[in-house]
Structures are given as structure tokens and as C-alpha cells.
Amino acid sequence: MRIKNGVWARKRHKKWLKLAKGYFGAKSKIFKQAHVAVMRSLRYAYIGRRLKKRDFRRLWITRINAAARQNGLSYSKFMNGLKKAGINLNRKVLADMAVNDQKAFAELVEIAKKQINAQ
């Protein structure tokens, strides 16, 4: 006796169509187009999760550089001074300080300047 895949095929199709909900036109209605669109969107999401890390690091460095230059020091010299002073703050925290707590950031810049001048 031949057993067809009707129930399971419908279940599989519904799963992909559910993931394609909100897509425009045939991409949310027709299984084949929905499957292709969802696979592409999942690929972009995967790539985006990796790009997000680079983008945020770049943003943090830009913010630190801008704040350090306002206090008379370049980014590379500032980071070098902090390293010599033994201050181990990551770029995320430094960028947050540069935006939200400029007084504390200015103190860090002064510490970095002293360490650079001491060498």
C-alpha cells in the first residue's frame, strides 16, 4: 500500500509559511517563494549577527576618539596611556563613560597623559 506524505507535507509547508508571515505578496502566500525568502532572510540574519559586533566596536572607538580629542589626546595615545597605567576598561565601558560621564572620562584622559609623559 502506498502511503502519501499529505499531512506531513502540509505541516512542513505551514511551518515555512508561518515564518514568512508579513512578507509582501507571493512571498507570504506561495510555499516555494516563501521558502526561498525565509532562507535568504535567515542567511542575512546570520551575517548581521556577525557584522553587529564589528559595527559596535567601530562605534565605540569613534566615540572614545572624539571624547579623547576633546581632551587633547588621540585615541591611540589614550589607549596606550591607559594600558601603561594598568587601567583595564573595555571599549564599551569607555564609550559609555565618554557619552554619559564626561568628568570621569576627563580624569582617565589625565591619567593617560601622565603615563605618556612619564615614559
Curated annotation (Swiss-Prot):
Keyword annotations from UniProtKB, A to Z: Ribonucleoprotein, Ribosomal protein, RNA-binding, rRNA-binding
Lineage top rank: taxon: Bacteria
Record InterPro entries: Ribosomal_bL20, RIBOSOMAL_L20_CS, Ribosomal_protein_bL20_C
BP term (GO), one: translation
GO molecular function terms noted in the UniProt entry: rRNA binding; structural constituent of ribosome
UniProt GO cellular component terms: ribonucleoprotein complex; ribosome
Family that this chain belongs to: Belongs to the bacterial ribosomal protein bL20 family.
Function: Binds directly to 23S ribosomal RNA and is necessary for the in vitro assembly process of the 50S ribosomal subunit. It is not involved in the protein synthesizing functions of that subunit.
Name of this chain's protein: Large ribosomal subunit protein bL20
Gene assigned in the entry: rplT
